[in-house]
Amino acid sequence: MEDFWEDWDLAFEDVFPKSLKEALEGIKEIPTYGERGASRFMYNLLKLEKEKRKEIIEKVLEAVEVLRPCRECFLITDREVCPICSDEKRSKKFICVVEESQDAYAIEKLERYKGVYHVLQGHIAPLEGISAEDLTIDALMERIKKYQPKEVILATNPNVEGEATANYIAGLIRRKFPAVKITRTAYGFQFGSLIEFVDEYSLEKSMENRK
């Protein structure tokens, strides 16, 4: 019986489409997208009708062109200053510090918090080569100096990186602005969770029970 594992004439590189390989490599440049995530995204996209694929890609390209960080809080928005920072009814006496825009939007869905946000655009992670200087911490200190908030709420993710980031920022605030109250969101969910994926009830309790 002929062995089907032998006499293979074509190399994998000859079979796998070059355009697909390049697309996957491009997707993998997006943070948190590895080989598996990129493949899942691309193959699911290819299952759609051609017109639907085109529609999705056009929407993504349009969003990339208009979206930018708010010049005040760094929340992703389609304006120079986001609706939250430009809303006079929002109290600048409360600044909620989050790692990413999606965390702020998760809290906004609760429709309870009436302060403003500050998006760090990441977290401190030495093993990944991310230091405090790579985040928007300096801008946060400037906002605290400018607005003299009553309270700064540290709502970084409940994981090792989030804790390290929160502790670093808390130390800075204590040294520079000793009169400012610093609170940390309570753990109403499992350590290692991401705020953007936490259910609304748990997130609301975490904000309410901050200390």
Curated annotation (Swiss-Prot):
CDD domains: TOPRIM_recR. GO terms for molecular function: DNA binding; zinc ion binding. Keywords: DNA damage, DNA recombination, DNA repair, Metal-binding, Zinc, Zinc-finger. It holds the Pfam family Toprim_4. Residues 93-190 form the Toprim domain. The keyword Protein biosynthesis does not apply. NCBIfam families: recR. HAMAP family: RecR. This is Recombination protein RecR.
